[in-house]
Design a protein with these regions (language model features):
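Active-site mouth of glycoside hydrolases
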Residues: 1-151, 161-170, 214-215
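Generic structural signal for well-ordered alpha-helical scaffold segments
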Residues: 40, 188-189
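A short acidic, glycine-rich active-site loop
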Residues: 72-76, 173-182, 226-228
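Acidic/polar loop patches that form or flank catalytic/metal-binding clefts of enzymes
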Residues: 98-100, 152-154, 197-201
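Short, hydrophobic/amphipathic alpha-helical packing segments
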Residues: 140, 180-188
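Aromatic/acidic polysaccharide-binding cleft in carbohydrate-active enzymes
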Residues: 157-172, 194-230
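Single conserved hydrophobic/aromatic residue that forms the stacking wall/gate
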Residues: 232-240
């Protein structure tokens, strides 16, 4: 994949699978450090890789899986691990940028996690999971107002759709093709007109497996711009 990206001139953000919840203990820290070091050493010579990542939505599960009285300990542990991984990354590759993706919650700013990497990545879904489209404008404008020095990437944005669902009156989270289209038609101009947003990635290119999801298509995250026709319409790959 990286060789194809090199040849096609595609830009790559590559990251290790440290996501959702940072475990306490030396074993987790050692494993994350090893994974980061291996990733950088294996792929250092690919010119398509422009940044390394080492956490994605790192505290999104804490409110559901950790008792309130233990939250501060987990926040401190996550912050310490992030600082350690940032130091490891810069020792391995002093030339590329570091990055981290956050879900749309101010806790990353509050605990200082968003101060560590070179680039801040926000996974934002206003108009899909929550609120309305204009909440996206308010979020990114306020973020830039408070932290004008930070390069900001919209590391994820997208809406789910099922090709079997069509609507003349599309609504938020209805999984119709029409709502996905409205979502993207709002987000793309909103991103492009803000020069402080230095990049954006639509999530996702194609529908993919997600075991825990029970939505329009069980076990599938269907935010893809393309879909697997075997899931919906065709009994045979030859018909796709």
């Amino acid at each position: 994949v990286l060789r194809a990206c090199d040849e096609l001139g595609m830009l790559v953000w590559e990251e290790i699978p440290v996501v959702d919840l940072i475990a306490l203990g030396d074993e987790f820290r050692a494993n994350a450090t090893s994974a980061l070091r291996e990733m950088i050493r294996q792929h250092y010579n690919h010119p398509s890789v422009i940044m390394w990542g080492y956490m994605n939505e790192a505290v999104i599960q804490l409110q559901y899986r950790v008792k309130k009285q233990r939250l501060n300990g987990f926040y401190e542990n996550t912050l310490a691990l992030a600082r350690h991984l940032e130091e490891t990354l810069k020792r391995e590759d002093a030339y590329r940028l570091s990055t981290m993706a956050y879900h749309g919650n101010q806790i990353y700013n509050k605990i200082g996690l968003s101060n560590i990497t070179d680039i801040s990545g926000w996974n934002l879904y206003q108009g899909w999971y929550e609120n309305d489209f204009k909440s996206f404008d308010r979020f990114v404008d306020e973020e830039h107002r408070k932290y004008p020095h930070r390069p900001l990437i919209i590391s994820e944005f997208g809406a789910g759709s099922d090709p079997r669902l069509q609507s003349l009156d599309p609504q938020i989270f209805d999984f119709s093709m029409q709502w996905q289209q409205l979502y993207l038609e709002y987000y793309l101009p909103a991103i492009m007109k803000r020069p402080f947003i230095v990049g954006a990635t639509e999530w996702n290119f194609i529908d993919f497996s997600s075991a825990s999801r029970q939505e329009a298509t069980p076990h599938i995250n269907n935010k893809g711009l393309m879909y697997n026709c075997l899931l919906y319409t065709s009994p045979s790959p030859r018909d796709c």
